[in-house]
Every structure is written in C-alpha cells, then in structure tokens.
C-alpha cells in the first residue's frame, strides 16, 4: 500500500510530533486514520475548506469511534500554525504556494511540513509548488511512495521550517 510505504519512510518525523494537522483532509481522511492507528497519543487535526467534506469526515470518525481527531472547516491559507509540530499538505490542496506562505508566516522554526506534490499524471489534477522560492524551508527528504514507477501520481517532500 502506497500510504504505508510513505509513512514508514517518514516515521522518524511523526514519532517526534505532538500536534499534527492535515490541510485538505477531505471526506474520507484515510491518511489521518493511518496516523491515528500508529500514533495514538498524537493530537490530530484535519482541516478542509469544504463544509461537506468536514461533515462527512466527522460522521465517519463518529462511526469509527475515533476520539483523538478533530476537524475544522477552514482554508489552509487562513489557519494559524503556531502550535503545530507537523503539517501535512494533501496533493489536491490549491493554492499550495499560498498555504506554504501562511505556514512560513505562522509556524515555529523546526516545524516539519510533509508536502505532497504531483509527478507525471498527477500534474493533471494538482498544483505543483516551488518551495525554494519562499526561502523559509530546508528540504530534509523526498519520498516516492509507490514502488511501481508507472503508477506515480505524487511524491512527498519533507521540509523543515528554518
């Protein structure tokens, strides 16, 4: 499973985190469910600018009886990331550059940003971003989640706030 491969590669960053947020969690936040299973003590937040997505995600966690995930209807360009240790930006989040600028303005030094960016056919669906233009982040790692290079839609960049 691509998500499992991806998170095994970034485990060292998540294991140090106390507060995690996913920007663009969507209606079925499978990434958050995996993180919740692996990191039960982690304070987890999912945000999305779609009220319908958040309503659906809240109904789903209620059915699953998950207690340590909170969801908020808010755009990633308006969130205050000052108390967040790890930020995960979903592949379909747009505009990614504005979200990254907001993170750079509000997060503390050392915050880890897990940024999914499109490759190959993924660029048809999602926006790429040049994080280097912002000069606020160092590239720590690059993770290609799929072992099958014909099936790659995105890669994960691990950034750290300077």
Residue ranges and their predicted role:
Residues 16-28:
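Conserved class I S-adenosyl-L-methionine
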Residues 27-40:
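Conserved SAM-binding loop of SAM-dependent methyltransferases across substrates and taxa
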Residues 43-48:
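Conserved SAM-binding motif I beta-strand of class I
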Residues 50-52:
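Conserved SAM/SAH-binding beta-strand->alpha-helix loop
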Residues 57-58:
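Conserved SAM-binding loop
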Residues 94-106:
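A short, conserved alpha-helix within the catalytic core of class I
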Residues 110-122:
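Conserved beta-strand signature within the Rossmann-like core of class I S-adenosyl-L-methionine
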Residues 121-162:
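Active-site capping/gating segments
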């Amino acid at each position: 499973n691509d998500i499992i491969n991806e998170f095994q590669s970034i485990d060292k960053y998540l294991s140090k985190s106390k507060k995690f947020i996913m920007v663009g969690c969507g209606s079925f936040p499978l990434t958050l469910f995996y993180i919740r299973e692996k990191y039960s003590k982690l304070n987890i937040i999912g945000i999305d600018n779609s009220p319908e997505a958040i309503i659906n995600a809240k109904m789903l966690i209620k059915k699953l009886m998950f207690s340590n995930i909170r969801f908020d209807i808010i755009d990633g360009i308006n969130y205050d990331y000052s108390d967040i240790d790890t930020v995960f930006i979903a592949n379909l989040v747009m505009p990614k550059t504005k979200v990254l600028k907001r993170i750079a303005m509000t997060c503390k030094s050392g915050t880890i940003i897990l940024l999914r960016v499109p490759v190959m056919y993924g660029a048809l669906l999602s926006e790429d971003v040049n994080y280097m233009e912002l000069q606020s982040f160092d590239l720590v790692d690059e993770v290609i989640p799929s072992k099958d290079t014909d099936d790659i839609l995105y890669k994960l960049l691990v950034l750290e706030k300077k």
